[in-house]
C-alpha cells in the first residue's frame, strides 16, 4: 500500500469512529429519555393514587360524621393540620408510610384531608424501586384558589410531590419532582 492509500484508510477509520460515537451517544440519549418518560408515567400514577385517597376523606375533622359547619372559623386552624392524635401517627420507617403492596397506614388511620399535611410515603415500583411522596395541605382564597389564605376557608389546596432519581432533570442535572395540585372543597348546600 502506498502512502496515498494509507491516508484514505486512516481517514475512513476516523469517519467510521466519529459515526460510531454519534450513534452510541444517540442511543444512550434515547434510552435515558425513555426511562425518564416511564418513570414520569409511574410518578403520575403514584401521585394520582395518593390524591384520590386524600380527596375521598372528609373535608375537615370538624365536618366528619355528617356534622355541618356554617362558618369557616369553626374549621381546623392551619397550625393544627397534620395527624390529630397518637392513634393517627404513622409508625412506619421513621414516620414515613412505606409499603411494597400499596397497603399504606394512612388509609386506615386518617379520616380528613388536613391529616395529610406533612405526610410522607415511599411507594415501591418493581422496575424503578422506591418513589418518595410528600403531601402539603393549606387553605386557599375561595375567590382566587391560587392564592394562600391566612385564615380558614372552605377550600383546601392539596399538593402531592413525587421524587425519584430517574425523573426528568433540569439544565443543572437536578431531578425535577412531579407535582400535582387539587382543591378539596367543603360543599355548602344547606
What are these regions (language model features)?
Residues 3-48:
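Aliphatic-rich helix starts adjacent to a transmembrane/signal segment
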Residues 45, 51-190:
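Low-complexity, Gly/Pro-rich coil/beta segments used as flexible assembly/activation regions
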